[in-house]
UniProtKB/Swiss-Prot annotation:
Phylogenetic lineage: Bacteria, Pseudomonadati, Pseudomonadota, Gammaproteobacteria, Pseudomonadales
Main location: cytoplasm
Protein name: 3-deoxy-manno-octulosonate cytidylyltransferase
EC number: 2.7.7.38
Pathway per the UniProt entry: Nucleotide-sugar biosynthesis; CMP-3-deoxy-D-manno-octulosonate biosynthesis; CMP-3-deoxy-D-manno-octulosonate from 3-deoxy-D-manno-octulosonate and CTP: step 1/1; Bacterial outer membrane biogenesis; lipopolysaccharide biosynthesis
Alphabetized NCBIfam families for the sequence: kdsB (TIGR00466), PRK05450.1-3 (NF003950), PRK05450.1-5 (NF003952), PRK13368.1 (NF009905)
Function: Activates KDO (a required 8-carbon sugar) for incorporation into bacterial lipopolysaccharide in Gram-negative bacteria.
Keywords per UniProt: Cytoplasm, Lipopolysaccharide biosynthesis, Nucleotidyltransferase, Transferase
Cell location: Cytoplasm
CDD domains referenced in this protein's UniProt entry, alphabetically: CMP-KDO-Synthetase
Gene3D superfamilies: Spore Coat Polysaccharide Biosynthesis Protein SpsA, Chain A
Family: Belongs to the KdsB family.
Any single Gene Ontology cellular-component annotation: cytosol
Organism: Pseudomonas savastanoi pv. phaseolicola (strain 1448A / Race 6)
Gene: kdsB
Amino acid sequence: MTAAFTVVIPARYGSSRFPGKPLKTIAGKPMVQLVWEQACKSSAERVVIATDDARIVEACQAFGAEVLLTREDHNSGTDRLAEVAAQLGLAADAIVVNVQGDEPMIPPAVIDQVASNLAAHPEAGMSTLAEPIDDVAALFNPNIVKVATDINGLALTFSRAPLPWARDALAANRDELPAGVPYRRHIGIYAYRAGFLHDFVSWGPCWLENTESLEQLRALWNGVRIHVADALEAPPGGVDTPEDLERVRRLLEG
């Protein structure tokens, strides 16, 4: 049985790489609507879109979503989630799942999975997902975040660099993945407890988070454990660029 949880979908209009991204149309609908529809297919008790832009509020209201207007000055999507959790009055132990607003094909099963994993691991303040890396180009791609975990499935660290660095194997050959090293790609979906979100904001960013531009490192820096599991179903990939948008359009529009 899936744990009770709320989904929050952060949707910013002013993306530096792709402004207006949540409202780009795919199969005749704004992208944020497709994300919302996928989240509504999960076991979530409630699905809320969080945005800092009135244009996105208007679009979300038009297709019937619950939407909250948040401040514009948040350092990260997790900071925005903390404001939403406070606005909704969620209990400290309530589970909140962050579904990125640029994942129009996110499988509902992985939304349920990340919530259930957090409920099953009270020692963790967060949970997230990963999948194996089977391509050496992905290992060296800084846009693909790598994760290493301990024997209990708790994150040791995340990095945009190859992680771990197979010293001898990569010194000899960087054209193939080192044999026997279980490289994993982080999938950017998270579940949190609402009380943790309050703590996360109060800590503020750390130098490691700022250096890698990875907000989950703030949690590790402050001693919070992050549970990581392999995704039951691999998400097909989000929309970071106009090229990604065209790829998703081809998939969904036929």
